[in-house]
Amino acid sequence: MIMPRYLGLMSGTSMDGMDIVLIEQGDRTTLLASHYLPMPADLREDILALCAPGPDEIARAADVERRWVGLAAQGVGELLRQQRLAPGAVRAIGSHGQTIRHEPARHFTVQIGNPALLAELTGIDVIADFRRRDVAAGGQGAPLVPAFHQALFGDSGKARAILNIGGFSNVSLLAPGKPVRGFDCGPGNVLMDAWIHCRRGEHFDRDGAWAASGRVNDDLLASLLADEFFATRGPKSTGRERFNLAWLQERLAGHPVLPAEDVQATLLELSARSISESLLDAQPECEEVLVCGGGAFNAALMARLAALMPAARIASTDAYGIPPAWMEGMAFAWLAHRFLERLPGNCPDVTGAAGPRVLGALYPA
C-alpha cells in the first residue's frame, strides 16, 4: 500500500532560500526527497523591506508575493522531475509562506505566499495560512513545530529538547508523562547574519568563524540581555519586528566603539545564553538537546551550547536520521496531513491558544 505523499515548503526568517521536502506519511513520517533553491538577492531585499513600515506596502507585498510563489513553484517542479513524479502523486503541499509581520500581542501575524496561485502553477492542492488559526484562538501563532517534534521524538522515555535555530531560535520540551511545551528563545542567527552583512557584505558567518575570532564584551552582552523579552516566560514568540539591525545599533550607540568581530562574538553569546538559560529554566532535568535548523551547522555556536549545558548531550537531529536543514519543511508537510485528516496541529501549552485547533486552509488545484 502506497502511503500518501506531501510536499512541505519553508522559507524562514533567515530568508536565504526555499526548502522543498517530500515526505511519506504513515504511522511515521518518512523523508523521501529534498530540494533547495537560493533566494535571489533582489527578492530577499524586497522581502526584508516589507518587514518594516514603508510606502506603498500593499502593492509591493503583492509583487513580492507573486515572485515568491514563482520561486516556490519552480522548486516544486524541479523536485518532482528529479523524483519522476507527476503532480497527482502528491496529496497536498503544506506551504508556510513568508512571514513579513508577526505581532501576536496585537493579535496578528502575516505570511505572504498566494496559495491560490501556487495551486494553479503546480496542479497540487495547497494547505496554507497555518499560523492565523492559532492566533485567532488567542495563541502566539508560534512556534508550531513542537507538535511535529513530539510525533517524531516524544517516545524516548527521557527529558529531551528539540532546538530549532533559524533566524530565531525556538525549543520544544519533551518529557515522559507531560504535555509538550515550547517557546521562542530569542534571536538565533538573525542578528549575526545582519551584522556580518552590514560589516563584511556576507550573508552568514560560516561555522561561526568570525565570531570565534572575537571576544565577548560583557557590558554589551548585559545590555542586549536586558531586553524584557528574555525575562518573559512562555508562551512567547518574537520576530524581526523586535530583533533587527536597528535594535542592535541602538544598543551599540551606548558603548565605546568595539571591534566588529567582538560584536559578532557577543551576538553569538547572546544566542547561546538566551537558549541555554531559557531551556534550563523550563526543563532543568534535560538530558538531551537535539538541534536542527541552520544553527546546527555553526560549530562555534554548538560548542558554546555544549559548554553552557554540560549535563545534557548536545547533538544534531542527524543523529536520529533527520537532516537538520529539512526539519521545518517536513513539519509543514506534516501539518498539511493533519489538516486533511481534521487533526489539530497546534499545542496550546506552547502557543497559549484556547485549545487544540486544526490549522490551515485548503486551496484546491
Swiss-Prot record:
It is an enzyme of class 2 (transferase). InterPro entries: Anhydro_N_Ac-Mur_kinase (IPR005338), ATPase_NBD (IPR043129). Disulfide bonds: none annotated. It catalyses: 1,6-anhydro-N-acetyl-beta-muramate + ATP + H2O = N-acetyl-D-muramate 6-phosphate + ADP + H(+). Pfam families: AnmK. Keywords: ATP-binding, Carbohydrate metabolism, Kinase, Nucleotide-binding, Transferase. Catalyzes the specific phosphorylation of 1,6-anhydro-N-acetylmuramic acid (anhMurNAc) with the simultaneous cleavage of the 1,6-anhydro ring, generating MurNAc-6-P. Is required for the utilization of anhMurNAc either imported from the medium or derived from its own cell wall murein, and thus plays a role in cell wall recycling. It comes from the Bacteria. Belongs to the anhydro-N-acetylmuramic acid kinase family. Pathway: Amino-sugar metabolism; 1,6-anhydro-N-acetylmuramate degradation; Cell wall biogenesis; peptidoglycan recycling. GO terms for biological process: 1,6-anhydro-N-acetyl-beta-muramic acid catabolic process; amino sugar metabolic process; peptidoglycan turnover. This is Anhydro-N-acetylmuramic acid kinase. ATP binds at residues 12-19. PANTHER family: ANHYDRO-N-ACETYLMURAMIC ACID KINASE. Its EC number is 2.7.1.170.
